[in-house]
């Protein structure tokens, strides 16, 4: 294929890129017989080279390729190299906080637009953009972000994605030499194609000690980026780096497959990670593989609807949304698919125990219960905490502080940049009659860890609250009609996945089955959490000010 020639890729006989079952493309073994006997004893005899790629695109080598134009195209090359340096150099400050993958998207956009404006750009990069990044339709979250924010407004991940897209677009418009209003749809296309294809490639820092000195770099690897992801039971290949040449190589793994027994058109599949994150898959690729049982781990995370948490108070008194804000508790649940193909709540996470804290209220109301107070008691505690009891105008200092924390309470931000002085607890666990702040949370957490009776009572109260939430959320999801998001696959896939998981959890509750993983396997305590939402800026910060401190 033309792209292989342009990008210096070598493809083994019997291998081809073809349409896959999800509407995209994959790499297939169309003629297994062509691979029989191709294993090289010098490589250990347990693998066959299917693909070798010399041209890899990442931030570093895109910069190098554009700088190299100075010596390749005389004046045109110098002009293009200077323009690229100018655009990127002036963009660094605006893009200092974005990920390296976002920078890769930005570099690709700049190179593409420079080519459109008549600047000399490297042919292989230009062809890759035209053929792959612009020629691949990926119905992932970035291509339907408006609909995703309508249906999942409460999920911080999609606000973060939207903010990244807006930041890249705004920077692009302001830095390109032609002040055209470049379409954000073009950016979304390149963004969606890039994030769905990017691979984490290890890069050597010091040749003499490679294993201890390398970084993982988000990279686009032509042809290899057509290879799809499989679980541990279907994976039959893996990629590696040729340390001597720097090439990326795709190997057929002969420890798991025998090419002589493969059927024609067997798909080549690699495993990216041991953790299969349904939400991440839908966000990046626009689809979620079916349930399966593997030696890996499949998870699904969802964020509570914060309006529900605020309007449906626990015990008719505790505003769960407000409580989670003040204690900076991530308002998300993580579900794990166990070996019996059942979705269960991951209660091994430290953050899950923090979710339980507001529910650690005795039903008898005589042992311990939470109290919210933003009046004189809160004022006293704030003044003591900030040591501002000797200011000239204490009333004015308190008024300013109260205005600020009230603004945060009503904002969409999940984290509060103040100590939780408005929340106190009356408890027989404490020597004092009343305590407050993060120390208070630690006391309750310690009691939860060391009192099985209290833990059971707390989880029961949490489950009762969750059961009502499930009824509410399932009703919302079941009102969804696919026509609402026609051709926006990521939205419909995410709704279907969340609905499926929540229905299974509710069924377990109705059948008096445990909904908790209750595993002693330490790997479950380290699974990744969803990000928290912190996108609104306080009105007392001007546009040029640094973001407020959330620590």
From Swiss-Prot:
Residues 46-273 form the SET domain. The keyword Cytoplasm applies. GO terms for biological process: methylation. The keyword Magnesium does not apply. InterPro entries: Ctm1, SET_dom, SET_dom_sf. Residues 184-288 are annotated as: SET-like. Its EC number is 2.1.1.59. It is found in: Cytoplasm, Cytosol. Gene3D superfamilies: set domain protein methyltransferase, domain 1 (3.90.1410.10). GO terms for molecular function: [cytochrome c]-lysine N-methyltransferase activity. GO terms for cellular component: cytosol. It comes from the Eukaryota. It catalyses: L-lysyl-[cytochrome c] + S-adenosyl-L-methionine = N(6)-methyl-L-lysyl-[cytochrome c] + S-adenosyl-L-homocysteine + H(+). Its main location: cytoplasm. Keywords: Cytoplasm, Methyltransferase, S-adenosyl-L-methionine, Transferase. The SET-like region, although related with the SET domain is not detected by any prediction method. Belongs to the class V-like SAM-binding methyltransferase superfamily. Methyltransferase which mediates trimethylation of cytochrome c (CYC1). This is Cytochrome c lysine N-methyltransferase 1. It comes from Candida glabrata (strain ATCC 2001 / BCRC 20586 / JCM 3761 / NBRC 0622 / NRRL Y-65 / CBS 138). The gene is CTM1.
